[in-house]
């Protein structure tokens, strides 16, 4: 399955390890297949969501043969930094690249492209945090020698998912640091003769997770550029990286994605219904990876539950018992993340009601499948101070994040909304 942190994978079944060229280990385990909801597509610049400015910069650098020795792709999590780095690596190694009106593309058909798509290309090295593993006496051992068979299997599975979905955030238990052994392995690999023509590209994913020792070792590698080698850092926290490293890289900002781009890709790639995709994208805050995480949540059921609580609070009479019962039911598991999501759903729903009260059928609303309900609610509370109600929900979200007692937070918000909509003194 390609290479990670200095490890080469091949497709033949053997037992154990054997030494490959130099001191780099070859791991011979057939990667397991993982069932994905993702509709697999060939990687290309067009498969990367948004980021047109960054694509133009990279394509121009390739076309004009002005590729930097080091890059730092930075921006919030889930906006495609790894996807951009992997596609760049694929294009510069393509055997038959195509020049188009928009720039330069990989052919998607040659052996090199197929290797890149599977993260199996010998010229592409993808480095990320690994567990510490067992200690060894040798400082030259590849970090893979420290890991158990179960850890190696999990890493293979995560790399397979990454090859199918470059927006996937690799998650390995007890892996929070990129250690010096991984960077030593990088240095070793870029100094060896390449086994295949093309440009060697090393991608350090979430580079801010490098230890101080690892960062110092990486700096030395940056200071000794090699022909046909490019080092790419990706990070959501570039301000935590040493300035000595950043100053030697071309820094490229990857901006948050638009709700429209996220929703469109949820529909096309994940098969999500358009109305649900719009709802999820409004939560994602510009991150496609975060949007994908929300796919496991029953957003519509949560939305219905929180709207029902609001309706209970707005009953003319005998509302307290029903409202308190529903609050207790909602907060029974003390799941703050779920409560926060439900409050965000309520906030978006109230914003839609406010927009509808101002523009009627011309309003641009997120909860398009709730238009009839929104119309009825807006009609029942004409002239209501929606901004004040929305602010009360925002304050409740803030209290949830600050660990204020959940039942008290929801009760205060609902009583405030009742006073606003029923105009109680």
Regions found by a protein language model. Name each.
Residues 191, 217-227:
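Conserved catalytic/switch belt of AAA+ P-loop NTPases
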Residues 39-213:
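Clamp-loader machinery-focused feature within the broader ASCE/P-loop NTPase space
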Residues 196-201, 226-232:
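Loop/turn-to-beta-strand initiation segments
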Residues 188, 220, 243, 247:
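Conserved adenine-binding aromatic site and its adjacent loop/helix in ATP-hydrolyzing domains
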């Amino acid at each position: 399955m390609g290479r990670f942190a200095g490890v080469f994978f091949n497709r033949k079944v053997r037992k154990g390890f054997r030494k490959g060229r130099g001191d780099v280990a070859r791991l011979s385990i057939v990667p397991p297949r993982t069932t994905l909801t993702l509709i697999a597509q060939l990687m290309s610049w067009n498969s990367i969501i948004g980021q047109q400015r960054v694509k133009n910069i990279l394509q121009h650098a390739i076309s004009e043969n002005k590729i930097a020795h080091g890059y730092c792709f930075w921006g919030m999590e889930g906006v495609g930094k790894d996807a951009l780095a992997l596609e760049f690596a694929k294009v510069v190694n393509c055997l038959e690249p195509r020049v188009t009106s928009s720039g330069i593309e990989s052919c998607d058909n040659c052996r090199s492209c197929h290797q890149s798509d599977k993260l199996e290309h010998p010229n592409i090295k993808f480095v990320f945090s690994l567990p510490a593993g067992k200690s060894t006496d040798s400082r030259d051992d590849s970090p893979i020698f420290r890991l158990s068979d179960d850890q190696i299997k999990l890493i293979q599975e995560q790399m397979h998912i990454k090859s199918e979905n470059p927006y996937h955030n690799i998650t390995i238990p007890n892996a929070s640091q990129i250690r010096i052994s991984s960077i030593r392995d990088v240095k070793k690999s870029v100094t060896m003769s390449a086994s295949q023509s093309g440009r060697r590209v090393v991608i350090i994913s979430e580079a801010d997770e490098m230890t101080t020792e690892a960062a110092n070792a990486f700096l030395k590698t940056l200071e000794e550029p090699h022909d046909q080698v490019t080092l790419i850092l990706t990070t959501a926290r570039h301000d935590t990286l040493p300035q000595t490293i950043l100053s030697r890289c071309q820094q490229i900002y990857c901006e948050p994605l638009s709700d429209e781009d996220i929703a469109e890709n949820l529909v096309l790639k994940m098969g999500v219904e358009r109305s649900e995709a719009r709802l999820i994208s409004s939560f994602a805050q510009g991150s496609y990876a975060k949007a994908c995480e929300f796919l496991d949540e029953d957003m519509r059921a949560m939305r219905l539950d929180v709207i029902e609580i609001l309706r209970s609070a707005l009953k003319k009479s005998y509302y307290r018992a029903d409202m308190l019962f529903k609050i207790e039911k909602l907060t029974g598991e003390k799941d703050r993340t779920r409560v926060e999501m439900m409050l965000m759903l309520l906030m978006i729903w109230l914003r839609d009601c406010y927009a509808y009260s101002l523009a009627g059928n011309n309003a641009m609303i997120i909860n398009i499948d709730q238009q009839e309900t929104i119309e009825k609610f807006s009609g029942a509370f004409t002239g209501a101070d929606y901004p004040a109600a929305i602010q009360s929900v925002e304050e409740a979200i803030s209290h949830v994040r600050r660990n204020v007692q959940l039942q008290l937070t929801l009760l205060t918000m609902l009583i405030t909304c009742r006073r606003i909509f029923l105009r109680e003194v």
